[in-house]
């Protein structure tokens, strides 16, 4: 078994991790790189793998830096199941078509400039139809249920309180009679927030892939922030 980091390694956006095992490969997230991270081969749509070879895709949450390349993945040949929580699947039903609309608008704007300059026209990274095609592959799952992803691979989604539907994903890979447990944290939320539940911690792992966007600082307690806002308002 191997884990390959195809995105969000030494950068913040573009989460995409590949697990390769005896039976093939699966992905955890397929996000769009944004800002300075966008100017890379992956950010321009060149996957470091063959999309049609991927058995399944698991999504931690709906934010575009974790899902924004899913329509392109499908456009390039991926046709496997996409597993996410039910809430994430519904949010992607809004966000992926919206992202496709932006891609189409950007291409249209660029082509107006290219026509005036006598340059070749460009195509959008993906279209609204590509987004709709990808949404047909989503399979909503419940928190805390162990599901089979493909032969030799199981997974469980655990609430991490980042946004509605967000999850850490525990993946069990069985090969050669040995079961290995890998935990992908996704983006982790904070305790004591309204509406969103507090993060839950999976019980142990052989390997942990942990987000570290704010790993070098301590957050102010939510109640202290509320008190400060209340005082400044009054």
Show the residue positions of the predicted features.
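Charged helix-capping and loop-helix junction motifs
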Residues: 42, 223-229
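Short, solvent-exposed loop/turn segments at secondary-structure boundaries
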Residues: 196-197, 219-223
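Catalytic cores of nucleotide-enabled group-transfer and carboxylate-activating enzymes in metabolic
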Residues: 2, 16-28, 46, 180, ...
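Conserved small/polar residues in nucleotide/adenosyl-binding loops
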Residues: 231-234
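Pre-active-site segment of Zn-dependent metallo-hydrolases
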Residues: 9-11, 21-80, 84-138, 188-199
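Gly-rich Lys/Arg/Thr-decorated short loops/hinges at beta-loop-alpha junctions or inter-strand turns
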Residues: 171, 205-217
